[in-house]
């Protein structure tokens, strides 16, 4: 993935979490965005920047920020995508509705998507689990010969894939 100009230089220096959500002034979305804000410092300590993205305009973002106590707390960037360019590029655009699906993308400093998921519109995401996924992606990036099993947490045992492990787990 390539990013233009100064934005590209900034984005290549860290890990990224793109967090697409359907729309401002809705129901599940503010609970997710508040949960992310409550964990934002932990993401920052990992060198991971969060970008929440909806197909709303910056004016709608501003109105929501001014209207909602939950959204007023947010300090990470809220990206407006009224042309649907990002949602289309990440293949989460619901063309018929002009909305983004509830998609999450973890991108490493090389610009490679290393984890992604798309939830149903009525199912919220968990910032604790997203943080764990970022930590796992960072671990395997730094330790190329190891993998993180289910429910892995930092400091827990990892696996080294080999023929000896085939059928042993």
Predicted feature residues:
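Chalcogenol-based redox active-site neighborhoods
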Residues: 1-169
